[in-house]
């Protein structure tokens, strides 16, 4: 009888489990029912409108899923996020989100409490798709993932739903709509292709949308960062990409060296753990072709991508790069990829490959990550707390970050590979003056505090805790005014804080001794505080003060209007927002002067802008001051030399398909309210630019090399291009475009040539030569290599073009040209305005052979006929980050079109 009772109880329990599982399954719409085909069908792509509708429908059909609009895109579309977990978890979602936040921020959470919360909480996993829109797999596999999560009832899926909260996010809606529609526009499936897009697949950045995450300049990035670092704090962030290395199917973590030196070691071991789960699942399912580490170029060095920025918030950022296209492809035969090895456990045979296979590989990867999170839920939750607490503790004591250049110097000091003593270690790697800062203070009395506030907002968007001084205070015998910003190191996101303020030191990384350098994944150095020209103090000891935590974002303090009843008002050229105020005044049809000498009666340097009192009401200035943060000072009429400013007619070069460098410049011009038109190669080659424009901006990549390489036929591919885009086809060449650009300048126009386009100076016949060449030979990469890094320029104040700049300027330099001015250059109107005056110009990153840069000229003003050429070889508009260099662009726009007629 007892056995029967137990058996009956067991049967009842079994029936309960089956009933519960069955009850959790609703009849949901399949992709075939919604779209008429399965996800990944040959020659088919779903667009974003269809994805959005499908997610909305599934959310209405399933109690496992809700959808949220996390913000608008740059083109105004709602950006959708699906939140998927068990119905029971949905009922307590706010509690689980708060647990995730508490453990990630760590502050005030003791270890005992952290362990308890780790047991109570749920793992939060972010999986996205579609960031790089032409990598079409990401967005398509996301729909398959969401469908499977709300429709499957197998034990693994139910366990994942119980233990994990999945955030499934389309991260580039505009791009998905563009690319899918472009592919599907052809009625004949055999003619469909994602190639030949007429515009960037993100309004401003294109592929660079995955380079914006520490700056957060784009709408989509800001939406994503808010969810990741201010709301949900996922332990895992999985970013889908394409394509896999040739001869494989996909690349997955772990990643190659070097790691960033600010990262917690648990990031590296955590990536190894998830990587093992990923590769183990592929092998167990017989899905070959998954490679890792040396199989690709991906590392954990760079900050700034959707995968990499999470590392600096103690989150495990994952990336897969997977082959596949709705048009079937071939896996090529690569003999070296056919032998099993540590970084490629199971090779894949070459042959035809269909998109549906890529969808299945993506789901294997998704389920490996979700299963890992479910099985290791408490470890993930506790470890994010542990990493956060490690950061807090490091920020509260003396610590030293061991950096490559210091290690190299220590090895040289010891000599010949000899081992040293503990005292040597402390002497060479723990000198008191080299310890990590406990925090950073950004004084509010700096001239360009508006840009400093924009820097602080980039930190805040990334979840960093920033304080504001409520009154004057002193640290280390230095007095700081109220309103100064304080960023302390004793916080969970300390790795990001250090990475934004401190220089990066990329190790010397070569294929073999004496061999070529191994290019870093993206930039080698990027210190944002340097790029933005923020003035700050490093504080090496603990400090306190009258500080309040900033909630939300920081507002640029309202400017003031000082004095009245004078001849006019001046405002400071050193404040980048002065150009915003200037453009608004000019849009009001007010006359503004540029003072070439310091104004009388106010402590401002040369370059201040002046407007007469009869040109503007004081109330209008008060409004501008409140809107822009710019201060206006009443002064007597200037007596020195001035330039009259007018709203210039600006042309910005672009190309068919979109230039990312031009796209970023377009955003900068819009942000500062410049009027401009975009022009293309055929319009430039048509001549007569001068009748329509005063200024032409040629961004990096516009001008071909003087040897004739580059450029393209004006009619190439025109037959496949919609009529409204055909006037954009073609490239500037030495024969078509360059002569017309030079004619534009000679006729009185201003040409601003940035980055590689500065070689326009050679075409103009300016007395320039290649500074880096020796005896006509350019150095090899084993002799000289400067991947994207921050370098320090010496600025010469011999022209209004450098007004607003200090004596030194940090610029992003990426194997850019460097010039020598030939003797007598100044007599023909060619002036050096910025150059490398030391043999160690590197500020942040990597520059092999940097001593070769010494003496090289990077900023040039040149007279050409009645007009001017401004040659800026650094990337002065780099990804909307290099605010410190923006005055070069803005000055160039206004200076070239100004005249010397007085306005008073």
Model-derived features with residue positions:
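Intrinsic-disorder/low-complexity accessory segments
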Residues: 24-164, 205, 211-212, 217-219, ...
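N-terminal Rossmann-like NAD(P) cofactor-binding module of classical short-chain dehydrogenase/reductase
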Residues: 238-239, 697
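Divalent-metal coordination cores built from histidine and acidic residues
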Residues: 161-166, 171-211
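Short, solvent-exposed turn/loop segments enriched in Gly/Ser/Thr/Pro and often Arg
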Residues: 168-172, 183, 239-247, 757
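Feature marks short, surface-exposed loop/turn motifs that line or immediately flank catalytic pockets
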Residues: 174-175, 244-246, 326, 704
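N-terminal secretory signal peptides that target proteins for export/translocation
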Residues: 1-3
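Acidic, glycine-rich active-site loops and adjacent beta-strand->loop/helix elements
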Residues: 131-133, 169-175, 215, 244
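Bacterial N-terminal signal peptides
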Residues: 8-20
């Amino acid at each position: 009888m007892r056995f029967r009772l137990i058996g009956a109880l067991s049967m009842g329990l079994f029936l309960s489990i089956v009933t519960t599982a069955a009850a959790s399954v609703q009849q949901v719409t399949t992709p075939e029912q919604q779209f008429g085909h399965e996800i990944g069908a040959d020659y088919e792509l779903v667009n974003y409108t269809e994805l959005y509708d499908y997610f909305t429908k599934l959310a209405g059909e399933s109690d496992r899923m809700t959808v949220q609009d996390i913000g608008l895109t740059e083109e105004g579309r709602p950006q959708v996020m699906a939140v998927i977990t068990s119905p029971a978890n949905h009922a307590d979602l706010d509690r689980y989100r708060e647990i995730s936040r508490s453990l990630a921020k760590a502050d005030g959470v003791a270890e005992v409490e952290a362990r308890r919360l780790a047991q109570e909480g749920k793992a939060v996993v972010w999986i996205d798709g579609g960031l790089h829109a032409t990598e079409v797999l990401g967005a398509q596999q996301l729909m398959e993932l969401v469908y499977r999560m709300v429709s499957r009832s197998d034990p693994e899926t139910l366990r994942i739903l119980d233990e994990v909260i999945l955030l499934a996010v389309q991260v580039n809606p505009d791009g998905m709509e563009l690319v899918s529609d472009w592919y599907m526009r052809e009625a004949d499936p055999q003619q469909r292709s994602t190639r030949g897009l007429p515009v960037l697949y993100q309004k401003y950045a294109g592929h660079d949308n995955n380079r914006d995450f520490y700056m957060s300049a784009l709408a989509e990035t800001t939406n994503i960062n808010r969810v990741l670092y201010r709301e949900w704090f996922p332990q895992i962030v999985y970013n889908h990409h394409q394509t896999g290395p040739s001869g494989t199917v996909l690349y997955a973590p772990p990643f190659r060296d070097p790691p960033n030196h600010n990262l917690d070691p648990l990031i590296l071991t955590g990536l190894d753990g998830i990587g093992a789960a990923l590769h183990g699942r592929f092998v167990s399912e017989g899905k070959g072709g998954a490679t890792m580490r040396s199989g690709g170029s991906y590392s954990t060095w760079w900050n700034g991508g959707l995968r990499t920025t999470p590392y600096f918030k103690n989150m495990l950022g994952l990336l897969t790069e997977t082959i596949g296209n709705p048009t079937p492809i071939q896996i090529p035969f690569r003999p070296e990829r056919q032998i099993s090895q540590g970084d490629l456990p199971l090779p894949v045979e070459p042959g035809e490959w269909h998109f549906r296979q890529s969808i299945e590989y993506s789901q294997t990867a998704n389920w490996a990550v979700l299963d890992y999170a479910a099985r290791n839920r408490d470890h993930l939750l506790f470890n994010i707390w542990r990493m956060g607490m490690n950061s807090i503790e490091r920020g509260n004591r003396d610590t030293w970050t061991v950096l490559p250049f210091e290690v190299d110097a220590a090895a040289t000091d010891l000599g010949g590979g000899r081992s040293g003593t503990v005292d040597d270690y402390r002497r060479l790697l723990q000198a008191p003056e080299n310890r990590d800062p406990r925090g950073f203070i950004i004084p509010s009395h700096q001239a360009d505090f508006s840009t400093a506030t924009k820097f602080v907002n980039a930190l805040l968007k990334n979840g960093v805790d920033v304080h504001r001084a409520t009154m004057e205070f002193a640290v280390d015998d230095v007095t700081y005014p109220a309103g100064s910003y304080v960023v302390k190191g004793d916080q969970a996101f300390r790795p990001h804080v250090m990475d934004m303020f401190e220089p990066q030191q990329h190790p010397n990384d070569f294929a073999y001794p004496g061999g070529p350098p191994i290019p870093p994944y993206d930039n080698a150095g990027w210190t944002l505080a340097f790029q933005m020209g923020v003035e700050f103090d490093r504080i090496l000891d603990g400090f306190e003060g009258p500080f309040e935590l900033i909630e939300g974002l920081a507002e640029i303090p309202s400017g003031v209007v000082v004095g009245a009843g004078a001849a006019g008002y001046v405002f400071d050229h050193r404040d980048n927002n002065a150009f915003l105020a200037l453009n608004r005044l000019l849009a009001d049809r007010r006359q503004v002067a540029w003072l070439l000498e310091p104004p009388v009666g106010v402590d401002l340097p040369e370059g201040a802008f002046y407007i007469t009192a009869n040109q503007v009401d004081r109330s209008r200035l008060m409004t501008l001051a409140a809107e822009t943060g710019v201060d206006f000072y009443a002064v007597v009429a200037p007596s020195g030399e001035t330039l009259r400013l007018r709203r210039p007619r600006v042309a910005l070069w672009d190309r068919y398909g979109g230039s990312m460098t031009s796209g970023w410049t377009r955003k900068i011009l819009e942000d500062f309210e410049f009027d401009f038109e975009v022009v293309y190669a055929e319009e430039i080659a048509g001549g007569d630019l001068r009748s329509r424009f005063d200024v032409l901006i040629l961004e990096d990549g516009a001008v071909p090399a003087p040897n004739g390489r580059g450029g393209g036929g004006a009619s190439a591919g025109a037959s496949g291009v919609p009529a409204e885009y055909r006037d954009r086809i073609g490239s500037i060449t030495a024969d078509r475009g360059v002569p017309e650009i030079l004619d534009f300048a000679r006729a009185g126009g201003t040409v601003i040539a940035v980055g590689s386009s500065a070689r326009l100076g050679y075409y103009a016949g300016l007395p320039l030569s290649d500074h880096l060449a020796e005896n006509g030979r350019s150095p090899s990469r084993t002799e000289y290599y400067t991947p994207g890094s921050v370098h320090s320029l010496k600025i010469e104040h011999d022209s209004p073009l450098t007004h607003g700049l200090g004596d030194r300027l940090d610029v992003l330099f990426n194997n850019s040209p460097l010039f020598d001015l030939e003797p007598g250059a100044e007599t023909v109107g060619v002036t050096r305005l910025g150059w490398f005056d030391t043999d160690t110009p590197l500020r942040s990153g990597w520059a092999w052979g940097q001593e070769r840069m010494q003496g090289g000229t990077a900023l040039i003003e040149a007279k050409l006929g009645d007009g001017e050429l401004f040659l800026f070889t650094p990337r002065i508009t780099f990804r909307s980050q290099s605010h410190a260099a923006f005055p070069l662009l803005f000055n160039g726009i206004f200076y070239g079109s100004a005249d010397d007629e007085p306005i008073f």
